[in-house]
């Protein structure tokens, strides 16, 4: 898989173009400011006079309604939540799409599953930082960047690569490295990573470990340190050095215990469950379930959020994070 860097990309394809960033959350703010600071012509499309409108104004952006931005722009970069995109697209963006324009995303969800179907003659691309928005902005300001992905679903103008690569360069992604993939691959791997490992798997593993120690009579504070707080140390080692060097950096006791016991935690059944989660993503079952949840105003999701907030590990964690001076990071 080829990795592109700054020297591989040029901004030329966007020099005379207007980019409308739709949405001003974490990614919207970071990506729009980075492109603006790279010398590109950026406008921000938002609901008029909302909190994001005022924030974008304060950051020095040319802010307008979504309809005005969609009409004005050559490239429309949609960065509002996945579940809102199709509705906003149909009512506020689609009427202003003309041949030669480019529709851009940072997640392929709505294109891949067919909730947004662009008209003929419109490019469809994706540029996705592989990092939270705050890190996208901070590393750019420090003169570097975060890695990212680019995809081209439809190349109606025969220069979609030039456009999406220029966006990646403007955001600062090519400073760290950019990989070209597909909407299908980006969407399905992103959802799987979130559900099975990064957000779902890891949190359930932490909770199970914490509860095991507490139920055995150990102090909740000790349980938190050993199953949650110290996780960052290990993740940072893996992030920076890989698995092999992580093992080299921990004690022999930790290495031997981890290598000989890990397969009893993540078993063949665990991997089978992961495969089923992946099938649900691939065949659209998860997407259908998520959209049904939206139709009932996220009742189940809200209930799960309340239950998570009531966990003992949350109470203990809040106390220890304050003790460690970490509360400012939350």
Swiss-Prot record:
Q: How is the cofactor bound?
A: Binds 2 magnesium ions per subunit.
Q: What is this protein called?
A: Ketol-acid reductoisomerase (NADP(+))
Q: Cofactors per UniProt?
A: Mg(2+)
Q: What does this protein do?
A: Involved in the biosynthesis of branched-chain amino acids (BCAA). Catalyzes an alkyl-migration followed by a ketol-acid reduction of (S)-2-acetolactate (S2AL) to yield (R)-2,3-dihydroxy-isovalerate. In the isomerase reaction, S2AL is rearranged via a Mg-dependent methyl migration to produce 3-hydroxy-3-methyl-2-ketobutyrate (HMKB). In the reductase reaction, this 2-ketoacid undergoes a metal-dependent reduction by NADPH to yield (R)-2,3-dihydroxy-isovalerate.
Q: What is the gene called?
A: ilvC
Q: Where is NADP(+) bound in this sequence?
A: 24-27, 47, 52, 82-85, 133
Entry-linked PANTHER family: KETOL-ACID REDUCTOISOMERASE, MITOCHONDRIAL
Its Gene Ontology molecular function terms? ketol-acid reductoisomerase activity; magnesium ion binding; NADP binding
Task: Give the protein family.
Answer: Belongs to the ketol-acid reductoisomerase family.
For this protein, the record's Pfam families field holds:
KARI_C, KARI_N
Domain KARI N-terminal Rossmann: start-end pairs: 1-181
Active site annotation, chain numbering:
107
Q: Which organism is it from?
A: Methanococcus maripaludis (strain DSM 14266 / JCM 13030 / NBRC 101832 / S2 / LL)
**Enzyme Commission number(s):** 1.1.1.86
- Domain (KARI C-terminal knotted) spans 182-327
Per UniProt, the enzyme's principal EC class comes to oxidoreductase
Keywords, in A-Z order: Amino-acid biosynthesis, Branched-chain amino acid biosynthesis, Magnesium, Metal-binding, NADP, Oxidoreductase
